[in-house]
Amino acid sequence: MIPDNINNTTKITYHYPKLSVYGASLQGRALDGVVSFEAGHYDSRQDRSGTDYTIPNSQTKFLIGYQKQLREDFTIGLQYYNEYMHDYSEYKKNQPSELPKDKKLYQLSTLRLTQLLFHQTLRLSFFAFYSPSDRDYLLNPEIKYNFSDHVWAAIGGLIFGGGEKWSQFGQLDKNDNVYAQIRYEF
């Protein structure tokens, strides 16, 4: 997005700068579970020096994950995600002071706990996101029941908090909610 005036914006022009993406992923058994790794490089071709604040700087990103069945029908999953911004000093120098600044190193970790009960028809799950860099979080507890092979229902909640008014989950701090769903699949 390109604003016509950073202090008194009346018009925004949407702009999609050229971007090249390179990446790789690996997954396999290790540590009595499944380990996965993904990495990617976002090459910001139109502003490799990082001086144009309207074009995101190049970034290197990676994700490492681990999943293990701790006992019958109970699994744990962990993930750690990282974004590293290149040319951060140029980004800070050229970003207008009125705008919040991204971090040079953004981190996000997740935890998923899943318990299956009653011949795997009832699923209790808890999914948590936490950003050590932004200090914000999202918690998602859920109960799901399969009435048949075609009909299931779930109830859960989304709890947001921490961080700043502009961080990924902090901006949703007042948007906690409870949801219910019934689904028929054919």
Task: Go through the PLM ranges and name each one.
Residues 1-74, 80-84, 89:
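Signature for the C-terminal beta-barrel architecture of outer-membrane proteins
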Residues 1-2, 47-54, 88-95, 126-128, ...:
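Outer-membrane beta-barrel translocator domains and adjoining extracellular loop/strand segments
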Residues 24-28, 37, 64-68, 78, ...:
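Residues on the lipid-exposed face of transmembrane beta-strands in outer-membrane beta-barrel proteins
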Residues 30-32, 41-45, 80-86, 115-119, ...:
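Transmembrane beta-strands of outer-membrane beta-barrel pores
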Residues 32-36, 73-76, 119-124, 150-155:
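Repeated loop/turn-to-beta-strand initiation elements of outer-membrane beta-barrel proteins
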Residues 60-134:
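C-terminal structural cap/anchor segments
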Residues 172-186:
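Outer-membrane beta-barrel "beta-signal"
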